[in-house]
Amino acid sequence: MIWNNIEKELIESRLLQIKGQSTTSDLTKLVNSQSRATLIQLIERSPEITVSIIDSAYEKYRYGLKPGFTLFWAKRTSIKTVPQQELANKIQEYLSTLHYDNDGKYKNLEYCSTVKFGDIYEISLSYLQRFNYINADGEFTFIYMMKECFVWVGINKNFIAMNNIPEVLMNSLKKFFSRLYSADITNIKITNKLLEKVFSSDNAKRVTKHNSNPPENQLEKITVADSRLSEKLSCIPAGYEDYDVTNTQYIEEIDGTTTGTLGVNCNKGKLYLSKSLTSSQFRTWSTRRINDIIGYF
């Protein structure tokens, strides 16, 4: 956003003024080494970057640097549909009834908006997270920072996915959707067989396996990692083949031109990417992978 909208000479002069410097030998390095707070100051001094440009950039990359989600079953006892506006009204009403500790680590879960893509509702939310620190006087204090998160509701396919939500708030949302849809909301456990069916073992680069009751001469947990792991399976000691996979990473093709590292937390049903994507890329990839997982069952 900075490079595309501000002339290089202006970037240099404004940033040097903020930093109290007179010159730089490498403008690109200078910009890339700055903190978020400094870059915000630069944007605030740059009328070229309008509110609409900021809003557009936010919408494009709204899912963050490492986008992902935790996937839940929504096992319904009856078929119940809720229109978009009714869904928005009910979740706002529910959130208004929640109570939090004044000094709690997470609090003030609030509704932001609801949009629909395909047959999925995306509910955007925000909450406050507490960060403790020592101030300039050496005193312990804290500050609350607003965090954004979202819920994808694919009730027609019996799933709900949540992003960037701490467990204590996630549990509150699970209760809400359980009551709203008369559904049992449970984590999808990603089993060894599901991994074999949905993801290519040729693309695996890191695997952690666990056995709570291992043979006497074997480890309880083992992690193997290599950029060419599929070519080096013979290096793994025998006896661990039937252990449960708890965490794994793959080289993942996101679309025809983009690849990244996909991480899978099997017990929690959590998938995440180590690559920043546009909103459309992430939604398209997520929908495909969710359908792959749901389709397995």
Regions found by a protein language model. Name each.
Residues 1-152, 166-167, 172-175, 183-238, ...:
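Intrinsically disordered, low-complexity polar/charged tails and linkers
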Residues 220-297:
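A eukaryote-biased signal for long
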